[in-house]
Swiss-Prot record:
Pfam families: CinA, CinA_KH, MoCF_biosynth. It comes from the Bacteria. Belongs to the CinA family. InterPro entries: CinA (IPR050101), CinA-like_C (IPR036653), CinA_C (IPR008136), CinA_KH (IPR041424), Competence-induced_CinA (IPR008135), MoaB/Mog-like_dom_sf (IPR036425), MoaB/Mog_dom (IPR001453). This is Putative competence-damage inducible protein.
Length: 413
């Protein structure tokens, strides 16, 4: 089965919002073995929408449309699909009741134009919307399948996952099963060299690598009738790659690095406190994104100025005077200071120059020090990072979590 994703909305063409739906839908279709051949975007114009839909139906078996299901006059998706397929729009009483219940629940008056959203093409399969008012639908007609879903991602995504994907999976007969191995501390080119012989002889299980935000993902993919069968076929290759990557491999479940590090702290009851300068609280923010972190996360201190480093963390004035705020020695004293103040098992600290200003020949933009203080001593990682301010800060955070992860691994043997 091949597919086209057709996004409807003038706001997409004007660049007011990004079409993140297409990326999400493509990934989910790939998971069940549906090939996505085209992404299209069209504005809120019935003539152009009709042309795009006809073209999509001509070249694909499946068309998934997002947007244009709302209550206003420029929401034209259902009307256009009904016209193209020769279907009538009929009132779906159950959907109307759900819309009324939604407005009652949020304590808002339901306007008359919202009734429009309960009119659906005759004979369709209704896709319930538990997060908004616009129901979606699936229509099968002359060997083609048209799916209509609302545009807002918080509404579209659960509707796709809970109803549309299971519906389509039954028809495909097989699914694409993928395993994602997440790696940090090895570049993409170095990683490829380490597994090139496996890439050269790949067969039923294919290997792909891609880098993003300082991390590398290895995707292992196969086709199978069931997910269990697919994972079973992938496992030998997964184990071989894991044995080569060793501690650089931090997840086989497509998890974020900060989540893995935080879970290791929680599972091993290792308490932590943080001291941040150039990252301005990003480490603390990402820690607190992880459920259960309150068991081990004591506090986070943002010590941006030299005065704050001395007053809040006990960094020595002579250290700052001799070595500067961005130095290995200052990072060490920050980590040791926050660990002592909080009485935690480990203290994590970062200091650096994120730019775009503040760099010198001796200490350029991108120079960062990450320090981890623990019962065995204090270790420091010097980083020379490239990119804009946001990238440098993000890579600093990832390196900090990587230090924590590797420390816990070493501690537990």
């Amino acid at each position: 089965m091949n597919a086209e994703i057709l996004a409807v909305g003038t706001e997409l063409l004007m660049g007011q919002i990004a079409n993140t739906n297409a990326q999400y839908i493509s990934k989910r279709l790939n998971d069940i073995g549906v090939n996505v051949y085209y992404h299209s975007v069209v504005g809120d114009n019935s003539v152009r929408l009709k042309k795009c839909l006809l073209a999509a139906l001509e070249r694909c078996d499946l068309v998934i449309m997002t947007g244009g299901l709302g209550p206003t006059q420029d929401d034209l998706t259902k009307e256009t699909v009904a016209e193209v397929l020769g279907k009538k729009l009929v009132l779906h009483e159950e959907s109307l009741e759900r819309i009324k219940t939604f407005f009652t629940r949020i304590n808002r008056k339901m306007t008359d134009n919202n009734v429009k959203q309960a009119y659906l093409p005759e004979g369709c399969t209704v896709v319930e919307n538990n997060s908004g008012t616009a129901p979606g639908c699936i229509i099968e007609d002359k060997g083609k399948i048209v799916v209509m879903l609302p545009g807002p991602p918080p509404e579209m995504m659960p509707m796709l996952d809970d109803t549309v994907i299971p519906y389509l999976a039954e028809k495909s007969g097989y699914r694409i099963v993928s395993k994602y191995l997440r790696v940090f501390g090895i570049g993409e080119s170095q990683l490829e060299e380490m597994i090139m012989d496996l890439v050269d002889k790949q067969d039923r299980v294919t290997i792909a690598t891609y880098a993003k935000d300082g991390q590398v993902t290895v995707r292992l993919t196969t086709k199978a009738r069931t997910e269990e069968e697919g994972f079973r076929e992938i496992l030998p290759l997964q184990n071989e790659i894991a044995s080569r990557l060793k501690e650089a491999l931090y997840s086989t479940e497509d998890e974020e690095l900060e989540y893995v590090a935080a879970k290791m702290l929680i599972d091993n009851n290792i308490t932590i406190a943080t001291a941040e300068s150039c990252t301005g609280g990003l480490i603390s923010a990402r820690l607190t994104d992880v459920p259960g972190i309150s068991k081990v996360f004591n506090r986070g201190i943002v010590s941006y100025s030299n005065e704050a480093k001395m007053e809040n963390l006990g960094v020595k004035p002579e250290t700052l005077e001799k070595y500067g705020a961005v130095s290995s020695r200052t990072a060490m004293e920050m980590a040791e200071g926050v660990r002592k103040i909080a009485s935690t098992d480990i203290g994590l600290a970062v200091t650096g120059i994120a730019g775009p200003d503040g760099g010198t020949d001796e200490k350029p933009v991108g120079l960062v020090y990450v320090a981890l203080a623990h019962s065995l001593g204090t270790e420091v990682r010097e980083l020379r990072l490239a990119g804009n301010r946001n990238r440098i800060r993000n890579l600093t955070v990832l390196n900090a979590f990587d230090m924590v992860r590797r420390y816990v691994m070493k501690l537990k043997g």
